[in-house]
Amino acid sequence: MSAELIAVYKDEQIIDLESAKVLGLSDGIKALKGTEPIYFDDSPLALEVIRHSCAHLLAQSLKALYPDAKFFVGPVVEEGFYYDFKTTSKISEEDLPKIEAKMKEFAKSKLAITKETLTREQALERFKGDELKHAVMSKISGDIFGVYQQGEFEDLCKGPHLPNTRFLNHFKLTKLAGAYLGGDENNEMLIRIYGIAFATKEGLKDYLFQIEEAKKRDHRKLGVELGLFSFDDEIGAGLPLWLPKGARLRKRIEDLLSQALLLRGYEPVKGPEILKSDVWKISGHYDNYKENMYFTTIDEQEYGIKPMNCVGHIKVYQSALHSYRDLPLRFYEYGVVHRHEKSGVLHGLLRVREFTQDDAHIFCSFEQIQSEVSAILDFTHKIMQAFGFSYEMELSTRPAKSIGDDKVWEKATNALKEALKEHRIDYKIDEGGGAFYGPKIDIKITDALKRKWQCGTIQVDMNLPERFKLAFTNEYNHAEQPVMIHRAILGSFERFIAILSEHFGGNFPFFVAPTQIALIPINEEHHVFALKLKEALKKCDIFVEVLDKNDSLNKKVRLAEKQKIPMILVLGNEEVETEILSIRDREKQAQYKMPLKEFLNMVESKMQEVSF
């Protein structure tokens, strides 16, 4: 069955076997020219078809178990699929095994999955009395609708789908949640059930293993266990508190970045947290981003708390006159920004309302775009290499709605392409995915569990310089508008540290570990030596803790291991008398001895091994 054709890919669309019949192709799908065949396997395109059909299998099973159930939408998403529905019955996660069993029953029944097309009038009549399906239709333009049937179940859908439920053997329902109708919190709350499906048993098994591993590595769990950060309801949702160990980890990353930024010609700047709404109107944020901003009134004037740092950096640029000899100007700031996120999407440090960006803005001439982007790509590689991340790039080009001349866009896009080519970086192209004011490169990193995360962005901006009438004097003594490059490599420290925590499972590499060395004196008489060693290590810029509670040696060692501290030094009579240290090295997975001076030299060298 793995070799069976289930669909084809043509013109960025998946066309299933039933859709080919509806199109009136006498030879079915094989009559379509210029197509890429999609076979029943665990490839991305095949999984889209499989998971879409599994969503319908879920809905069919829900209808059988809860006859009054009504369904909204059941799309394929990054984590599998889901279906939003409502019923008068109370459903909890404890019901998922029962629902899953019914799905398996329908799958074994080998029900044919067929398609018909209806006019809008016919579809409204077919789903008469179903307000959720009417809500779906109200959001769809056009007057032709697809309806897929399997057994006694049918659903409004454009596809694609498998030809038969017999294909669906390897799936799992993963969780139950609430979801507002259409994502609007003013609407009624529906039930959402998530699931995952694969073509093969191995695909499902590997995925479920990854899910269990992800639970162990969940940064919210690690944040508590390792004392990195916390949240407090009295302070507010989405507003993290950095605890001492988390702040140490963050500061280490900030310091390494600052050193690299200064060496690369960036100047530190700092803008205010709140700015008059007048500037947000000039920038366009007031009209296009207002619902994500927080506002306050001071002396009868409206101010907006900044959701981005770009306007402040523009004002720094405008504080002086510039000639072409000054360019490029590179400003950076660890800028604290606030964005209103709905409470339902907040997620640990990954999605918060206050966060700090490793933000920079480069003001340059058009001719300097390629060299500046090339330097950013080099910088990005150094950072990702230091943390052991693999990454990929995606170039987003001009959208249908945009500003600027065609030649200017082409020149800017080609500059990004040439910079990527210069670094021999394979990249994907998102045609039409750029911002209305310029092309961009997105940086996506892959973690230890092979999950992809959107982090940094390199964005060429031809809009804000025009809105704020930025200028520099060119070599012909004429005023010329600079290009502005928005650049964040980590994205935000909060998000990056969340990803870093899950990537390493809390076992941070030595150079950024919140506690790098634990000193464990065996008895009280060894405490003085431990404090002396602590001071020596602090001079080497090492984060060190002395575990001197009145506990057994084994308990103190277990505590240090539980805290995932890279190096543990047990200090007893022999170590005090000989100054030869006993070291437990997590990274080397070894225990060894080393003279004190040699050890201090070693850790000092380890701290100098990593730079961006």
Curated annotation (Swiss-Prot):
Keywords: Aminoacyl-tRNA synthetase, ATP-binding, Cytoplasm, Ligase, Metal-binding, Nucleotide-binding, Protein biosynthesis, RNA-binding, tRNA-binding, Zinc. Residues 218-509 are annotated as: Catalytic. Homodimer. Zn(2+) binds at residues 310, 361, 486. Belongs to the class-II aminoacyl-tRNA synthetase family. It comes from Helicobacter pylori (strain J99 / ATCC 700824) (Campylobacter pylori J99). It is an enzyme of class 6 (ligase). Its main location: cytoplasm. This is Threonine--tRNA ligase. Transmembrane segments: none annotated. HAMAP family: Thr_tRNA_synth. SUPFAM superfamilies: Class II aaRS ABD-related (SSF52954), Class II aaRS and biotin synthetases (SSF55681), ThrRS/AlaRS common domain (SSF55186). It holds the Pfam family tRNA_SAD. Disulfide bonds: none annotated.
